[in-house]
Every structure is written in structure tokens, then in C-alpha cells.
Regions:
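Outer-membrane beta-barrel transmembrane domain signature of Gram-negative proteins
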Residues: 379-385, 390, 399, 410, ...
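Transmembrane beta-barrel wall of Gram-negative outer-membrane proteins
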Residues: 227-375, 379-393, 397, 804-805, ...
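N-terminal periplasmic accessory domains that precede
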Residues: 110-113, 117, 138-139, 174-176, ...
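N-terminal periplasmic "start-of-domain" segments of outer-membrane beta-barrel proteins
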Residues: 71-107, 132, 161-167, 214-216
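Short acidic/polar hinge/loop motifs at secondary-structure boundaries
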Residues: 155-190
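C-terminal beta-signal and adjacent terminal beta-strands/loops
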Residues: 651, 772-783, 808-873
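Extracytoplasmic beta-strand/coil segments of soluble accessory domains associated
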Residues: 115-159
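Gram-negative outer-membrane beta-barrel transporters
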Residues: 467, 641, 645-782
Length: 873
């Protein structure tokens, strides 16, 4: 609960739609309070005048170039290919989040850092959702995780191998693979940009700029939650050297580890066994609901070298290892289909007689104890991720007006899944207790040629004409697990489940490798018609070997109404091509039928499978978007900046899972006769379809004020707000049910607010940050829809969290910071878990040991304290 304040039940009464209805509606764009120079202006460049300020960065250390913490004259490289475009003169909203501000968030996960510094960015914490425990779905403007393009130094980053079935099958970049030590700043373009960058840039673009300077810096941080668990460590170092007079080499490394947390009660079935005298039940809880145990090590390199006066070689890359482990659902020692048969006696008896004698003895003499689990078991699920990337290129200028850049890139993510302290019940006394359940791998390769021409046309500035092409190849692979992780053993005939219990292994019928190629060409024109009026036009054509062709365009403009006030707006079309993984995913499991005489196969199959085609499955097409934004940026006072933008994003043909189908005997016979053996025994299935259309609209605003308080002191104040709402406009029959609709429209807060105050005096500083999230819904509490069908949801109210930190320079090069995240130990509402509508009416109580919601858009582990030591030479 929000103990010191009575604010958590506040409700917003003005809808996002109403705010977005008029021409003058405002939307808050998060211009970070620590915006800094993105790059030096090109030699000889003369950008249009922009407001500038003076100030200090977080931590009280002045910027090297004297730029202030809310510097609208900072040059940005995202959303434009003009080398002198500033934040103030940009035609689209851009956030620039500096390394110091990211460091003020104690979490070592980049997703958490961006969530607390960019209000329109959200990441969920999912303690019980298979791979999503470790690959957490992150969203920009409430859209799908893979509808945001991620770049490193302006080059496309490869995807994770994980396909997140909790987020409509999204396959996105894993931002947790990118360490703070390597980052100079993060630029977040919150506008459609597919016409400039290609697939995925529907919600926007996150461009991570790596450090490239000389010297060394680093940090060591330790912390723990107020509850006494979740101890965590984070350490990173960055070092840069000159390579003679022509180049530079910069290396970054980071190590992190974290112990698990538990915010749980004892499960009722375990408590009942304890009361009956079972001394083997784990206490205080058999199952932990909380954060996983984690370990990670990441290395980044960034280098440049001048080959001549007009040619430069550059390269950057990374390698990473991430491991995590968490509890799955508890299985009690009398669990049906695990230790006891669910078959009726007339079926069980004849089947039992066919078992080998060792299996019969095992079943008749306490199978739980003989398997090593007299108190039942809680499977421990883990994932090991190996990540690698490399980008290399050459760039230069053919003339003073023509720049060129030729590059190639490679990226891969390999995930291994394991489960232990479990069994394959169908193998009875011969079952292993730990399993390798399979692998997933995503590999991306690409090559780019980009040219930039400065065309003199007698305008305020030369017209910037950028054009180029891109070729890409993507490969998705599924590898098999241990045979015992997916096979059904002899005891399957008596109704005991096959496969590794808790997480079914990948079998040969699911494994495979799928690839696709794509080529693209683009033109991007940026013209300053006058000093105060600019226009941008971009177009891109792209062809995919498996998803057809698409052409997209963008028109943007900026109008300087006053010297300190710019209006801006953009209209664009966009797209996201389905990934090879989504187009070819096979995720099935096998278990005995209730009669024990046959095997049931259920799961997800590719939409192009002949079985899917029988039910309307076709090759997936790209999702298509239409994006409109309008806003302003202003600096009414020397130290005060304000920006606001309203947006609307319509997305058609969004990809989702179909309803579940079954085959009639006649359909099975026809498929078998046409050479489709997989139809044999397929009980039920679904597949991905381009099935629904949505509209997302909202408002982004930021206010930043750097207030001088004397010669050595100042107060940095910022307030940022995001209002965001998604509605389902239409859906194909059988694709979206009531529960899925709730997930699309209401799984995330429609409001996120961040307010921070940083007082700086000399080398000492104190930072207070407040984070508020609006209400949201999780599918847990049984209700019925208009048709009387049972659906599950529970509404959770707004929450506010306070963070406090203080730091000072111990020496010229060393700094100490101590702080508390979630200072007042606030927790969300407790979740209700009734199993029936009658239970809900009678008053729900926590059950199954879970106390807090399992799909929360913020942590539910309470407050934590930490200390951090940093150095900079």
C-alpha cells in the first residue's frame, strides 16, 4: 500500500480519446532532463539557431561541452539523416536519455531503466510465464514489443530467439542484453518511421549510441529488498584508448547477479498435507512467486580507424551470457496424471496389467516417494541465453557534398531451456529428474549502402537527400530436447503424463530451420525551406521472400512560430513483417487421452500447414499502420522547456492466434490420403493469423526546469506524462475472444507519470523521483461476458512509487551514491484467485500461494536499498 499518501485510489475521469479529439490537443513528449549533445556538428555546418541553456547533468558534473541538462540545441541522429538536426528543430518527438540518468535507476536491466526514464515505455514482470520470466515483454506506446525498432549506433539490432506468447506472439529485441557501461545515451524516436528504417518501426525507434571516448569509468553496486531477499550485484567498466592519431578503441564489460525473491503464501494443498503430517513439504512455501535468480556477463566493443583523409573504418560488436531460474507450479504427491491415474477402473485395470513389473511395483508402493518426491515437487525452470553480434563498415565522403556508408552486420541469439526437480511421469521408476527441453536460435544478417547528398538549392540550408538500400536474411531454428523431455513412456497407458512435467520438450516434429530474404530501397529528403520552416519526405519499398512487398511513405514538417516555439507534425504509413519464427512456429504437446488407449496432440502449428489451410490458414502478411502526430516544443524561459505531442496509430492485419480447431474423421482421412501424416492423432490446434485491427491514441508531455539557486547550486525539476489508449476496431471471426480483447485494450496502465527533483550543490546531489501508474486489468477474477461466457479479470488501481538517492564525490575521480527504490515499500492490490463465480460472490481470498498479480506492469517486491560506487578517469 502507498502508506504515507492517500493517493492510490485516484481515478482519471478524462478519456484519452477526448484529449486527442481536437487540433489543439496536447501530448507529452519525454524530453529527458539530461539531454546532451548527440554528436558534434559537421565541419562548416551552420544549423538554424535553437534555444540553449546552461546547467549540469545528474550527479552535478557539468557537460564537457557546456550543454545544459535540458539543451534543445543538442544534435540528434535518430529520425533524421541530416547531420546538424537538433531536438528543437526536429519534426518528430525525440527523447535523449543520458548515461547518468540511466545509472540513477538501480536495476541492472535496461528495460527497467527505460521504463523509469521514458514514460511511454513499459515492461511487465511475469513471474510464472515460461520464457517470459526472463525475456520480459517491453512496449512503447502500449503496442506490441516487436512493433518498436531497436538500433545500435544506427544499425538494426538482431531479435531475441524467444517468441512471447503472452504478447500475441511477439518476437522482439532483448534490451536486457545491452549493458549500461557501454552506453553513451539512448535516443527514443516516438513516431512511425518504417519509411525511413523499414519493418518494426510502427511505435517508434530506440537508438542506443555506444561510448567511443578515451579514459576509463566504472561502477560497483549492491542492494537488497526490504524483505531481506533478492540481494543483487552489478559491476561494470568502460575503457577507451586512442589508436595512434587515426582511431579509437572502446571496451565495456558488465557482470550482474541477483537472488530470487518470494512474495508468497503457502499453497492450500501443501498446507493441508502439512496438517496431515507430511514432513517433506517445503517451508515456508513450496512455491516462490517473485523474481528469478539471475546471472549475466556482457562484453561490448566499439572502434574506428581512419584509412585516409576521407575514409574511415568502423566496427562494433557484443557477446553476452544470461542465465535465470525460477519456480513453476507445485505438484502435490497425489497429483492426478503425475502420481495417480485419472482413468476409470474399467479402463485402468486392463491397461495396468500391460505394464512391466517394475512399473507396477512403483505405482503400487507410493510412486511419489519412490521418485524422490514424498512431499511432491516444484519444478525449477531455467533459461541460458548466448548472444553475439558484429557490425563492420567503411564510410567517408566522395565530395564535400556526398557522404557514403557501406556496412555489414551479423547477430544471433541462442536460448537453451532446462527444467529440474521434476519428472516424466510416463517413465515411472525410470524417469530422469532433470531435462534439457530444447533450444531456440535467431540469426540475422544484413548489408547496407547509405548515401547522403547535400543539394544546394538557394534555400535557408542545402537540401539533404539521403538514399540507399538494404539486404537482409533471417533464420529461425528450433532444436530438440532430451528424448525423455518429449516422449511418452510405458506408463502413458494408465494416464500418466508424458514429457518433462512443467515444460514439454521440443520433439523432432517441431524442430527445424526456416529462413527468409528481403531487399529494400529508400529515399529520405529533408529541406529547410526557410530558417523557421522545414519539410521532410521519405519513401521506402521492401520485398520479403515469404511475405510479399510493401511501400511506405512519410511526410513531416516543422514551423517556427516564434524564436522559442516550434510546431511539428508528421503523417506516415508503416509495417511489420511477420518473422520466420512466427510464420513457422510449431509448439505442440502430447498426452494420453482419458481412456489411456490413444495419444492426444494439441498445440500451435504454422498457418501454411495443410491442416491449417483446411480451416482458413494462409501465409502471414505484414501488419500495416497509419500514424499521425502533432505537437510543439518551446522554451519560454532560458531554463524552462516544454514539449507536447498528440498521436494516433491505426494498425491493420495485426497478428494473433486463431481459435482452437479440431478435425473431423472425414477431414483427417482426406488429409492422410493427400500425404499429410501429421493429421493422424491431431486433437486440437490453432495458428497465427492476420486477424484484427486496432487504434492507439494518446498524449505525451514533458516539462523541464533547471532553477539556479546560487553560484554552486541548482534544482533540476522535470515532470513527464504519457496517456495512452488502445481499442480493438474489428477482428476476424474466431480470433479474438473477450479475454484476448481485455489483454489488447487494458493489460497496461493508460497513464504513466514521472516527476523528479534533483538538488545539486557543488559535487553533491539529492534526487527524488515519483512514478505513478494508472489502473489496469489482469484476467483473474471470474465474471461473464454479454453472451454468458466465463472470462477472468481483476481491476487494479493506480499506484505511486517514490525513489530517493544521494551522492557526493569522495575524491576527484570517485563518487558514492546511496538510495532506496520504492522508498515507502508500496505494494499493488492483492490479487483474487477464486475458481468459480460462486467463490467470487462469497468473497475471494488469495490461493495457490500467489499474493500479487502475475502480469503486473511494475515490480511487486516492495522497497529496496542500494549503494553504488563509481569512478571516472
Amino acid at each position: 500500500m502507498c502508506m504515507p499518501l492517500s493517493c492510490r485510489r485516484a481515478r482519471a475521469t478524462v478519456s484519452v480519446a477526448a484529449l486527442c479529439a481536437g487540433f489543439f490537443a496536447l501530448s507529452f513528449v519525454a524530453l529527458s532532463p539530461t539531454t546532451v549533445r548527440a554528436q558534434d556538428s559537421a565541419p562548416g555546418a551552420d544549423p538554424a539557431p535553437s534555444p540553449t541553456t546552461e546547467g549540469s547533468t545528474n550527479g552535478g558534473t557539468a557537460d564537457a561541452d557546456g550543454a545544459g541538462s535540458n539543451d534543445l540545441a543538442a544534435v540528434v541522429v535518430t529520425g533524421t539523416r541530416r547531420t546538424t538536426r537538433t531536438i528543437f528543430d526536429s519534426s518528430a518527438p525525440i527523447d535523449v536519455v543520458k548515461n547518468d540518468e540511466l545509472a540513477s535507476v538501480p536495476s541492472g536491466n535496461m528495460n527497467d531503466k527505460l521504463q523509469q526514464t521514458v514514460p511511454s515505455f513499459n515492461v511487465q514482470r511475469l513471474p510464472l510465464f515460461d520464457g517470459a520470466i526472463f525475456n520480459r515483454p517491453a512496449t512503447l506506446r502500449g503496442l506490441s514489443p516487436d512493433q518498436t525498432l531497436v538500433l545500435i549506433n544506427g544499425k538494426r539490432r538482431h531479435r531475441s530467439a524467444y517468441i512471447d506468447v503472452t504478447a500475441q506472439g511477439a518476437q522482439a529485441v532483448d534490451l536486457s542484453e545491452i549493458p549500461l557501461a557501454a552506453i553513451e545515451r539512448v535516443e527514443v524516436l516516438r513516431d512511425g518511421a518504417s519509411a525511413q528504417y523499414g519493418s518494426d518501426a510502427i511505435a517508434g525507434v530506440i537508438n542506443i549510441i555506444l561510448k567511443d571516448g578515451e579514459g576509463s569509468s566504472g561502477y560497483i553496486q549492491g542492494g537488497q529488498y526490504y524483505e531481506g531477499d533478492g540481494a543483487n550485484f552489478l559491476g561494470g567498466v568502460n575503457a577507451g584508448w586512442a589508436l595512434g592519431e587515426r582511431g579509437s578503441l572502446n571496451l565495456s564489460a558488465e557482470l550482474s547477479s541477483g537472488l530470487s525473491t518470494s512474495r508468497s503464501n503457502q499453497r492450500p494443498n501443501a498446507a493441508a498435507l502439512l496438517a496431515e503430517g507430511n514432513a517433506f513439504i517445503r517451508q515456508p512455501v513450496v512455491q516462490r512467486f517473485g523474481q528469478p535468480e539471475t546471472r549475466a556477463a556482457v562484453l561490448f566493443v566499439n572502434a574506428t580507424y581512419e584509412l585516409g583523409d576521407s575514409v574511415e573504418l568502423y566496427a562494433f560488436g557484443s557477446g553476452g551470457y544470461h542465465w535465470g531460474e525460477n519456480d513453476f507450479n507445485y505438484r502435490n504427491p497425489t497429483q492426478g496424471s503425475v502420481f495417480t491415474s485419472t482413468q476409470p477402473p474399467e479402463v485402468f485395470g486392463p491397461n495396468f496389467a500391460t505394464l512391466p513389473p517394475a512399473y507396477q511395483d512403483w505405482y503400487n508402493n507410493n510412486p511419489a516417494a519412490l521418485s524422490g518426491y514424498p512431499g511432491g515437487f516444484t519444478p525449477r525452470f531455467s533459461a541460458t541465453s548466448w548472444d553475439a553480434s558484429a557490425v563492420a563498415g567503411v564510410r567517408g565522403d566522395l565530395t564535400s557534398d556526398l557522404l557514403w556508408d557501406l556496412s555489414a552486420r551479423y547477430g544471433t541469439n541462442h536460448i537453451e531451456y532446462h527444467i529440474r526437480e521434476t519428472l516424466n511421469a510416463s517413465f515411472g521408476p525410470e524417469s530422469p529428474t532433470k531435462f534439457d527441453t530444447g533450444t531456440k536460435q535467431q540469426t540475422d544478417l544484413g548489408a547496407n549502402l547509405d548515401l547522403n547528398y547535400s543539394l544546394g538549392a538557394g534555400l535557408a540550408e542545402p537540401i539533404n537527400v539521403a538514399f540507399g538500400g538494404e539486404a537482409r536474411r533471417e533464420i529461425y531454428e528450433l532444436g530438440t530436447g532430451d528424448r525423455s523431455s518429449y516422449e511418452i513412456g510405458p506408463a502413458g497407458v494408465i494416464g500418466l503424463a508424458g514429457g518433462s512435467n512443467g515444460f514439454f520438450g521440443t520433439g523432432p516434429n517441431q524442430a527445424g530451420s526456416w529462413g527468409r530474404n528481403s531487399v529494400a530501397g529508400y529515399v529520405d529528403i529533408d529541406a529547410d525551406i526557410t530558417r523557421r520552416f522545414s519539410v521532410g519526405v521519405a519513401g521506402r519499398a521492401e520485398n520479403y521472400s515469404d511475405a510479399g512487398s510493401t511501400i511506405n511513405g512519410k511526410l513531416s514538417s516543422r514551423l517556427g512560430v516564434l524564436e522559442q516555439l516550434n510546431l511539428r507534425g508528421a503523417i506516415s504509413t508503416g509495417f511489420r513483417a511477420p518473422t520466420p519464427g512466427q510464420a513457422n512456429l510449431t509448439n505442440t504437446n502430447q498426452n494420453p487421452a482419458p481412456d489411456g488407449l490413444s495419444i492426444q496432440t494439441n498445440g500451435t502449428i504454422p498457418p501454411t500447414n495443410p491442416i491449417s489451410a483446411l480451416k482458413g490458414g494462409v501465409q502471414l502478411e505484414p501488419e500495416k499502420s497509419f500514424n499521425v502526430s502533432l505537437g510543439f516544443v518551446a522554451q519560454p524561459l532560458a531554463q524552462l522547456t516544454l514539449s507536447a505531442d498528440v498521436y494516433r496509430i491505426d494498425i491493420d492485419d495485426r497478428i494473433g492466434l486463431s481459435q482452437r480447431y479440431t478435425l473431423t474423421p472425414e477431414e483427417q482421412a482426406a488429409l492422410l490420403a493427400s500425404g499429410v501424416p501429421a493429421a493422424q492423432g491431431l486433437t486440437s490446434f490453432n495458428f497465427f493469423v492476420n486477424g484484427y485491427n486496432t487504434r492507439t491514441q494518446g498524449l505525451d508531455v514533458v516539462l523541464a526546469y533547471d532553477i539556479p539557486l546560487g553560484a554552486a547550486s541548482h534544482l533540476n525539476a522535470t515532470a513527464a506524462l504519457n496517456l495512452n489508449e488502445t481499442e480493438l476496431r474489428s477482428a476476424s471471426a474466431g480470433v479474438i475472444d473477450a479475454r484476448q480483447r481485455q489483454y489488447i485494450e487494458d493489460r497496461l496502465p493508460k497513464r504513466a507519470t514521472t516527476v523528479s527533483l534533483e538538488y545539486v550543490h557543488g559535487s553533491a546531489s539529492v534526487l527524488l523521483r515519483a512514478r505513478e501508474y494508472g489502473s489496469w486489468t489482469e484476467p483473474l477474477d471470474p465474471t461473464t461476458d454479454e453472451a454468458g461466457r466465463l472470462i477472468f479479470n481483476q481491476r487494479f488501481g493506480p499506484e505511486i512509487f517514490f525513489d530517493l538517492s544521494a551522492g557526493f564525490d569522495v575524491t576527484e575521480h570517485w563518487r558514492l551514491t546511496v538510495g532506496a527504490e520504492n522508498l515507502f515499500d508500496n505494494y499493488p492490490d492483492e490479487a483474487r484467485f477464486p475458481n468459480t463465480a460462486d467463490a467470487a460472490a462469497a468473497g475471494a481470498i488469495p490461493s495457490n500461494g500467489r499474493v500479487y498479480p502475475s502480469q503486473r506492469p511494475y515490480e511487486a517486491d516492495g522497497g529496496r536499498y542500494y549503494a553504488r560506487v563509481t569512478f571516472d578517469y
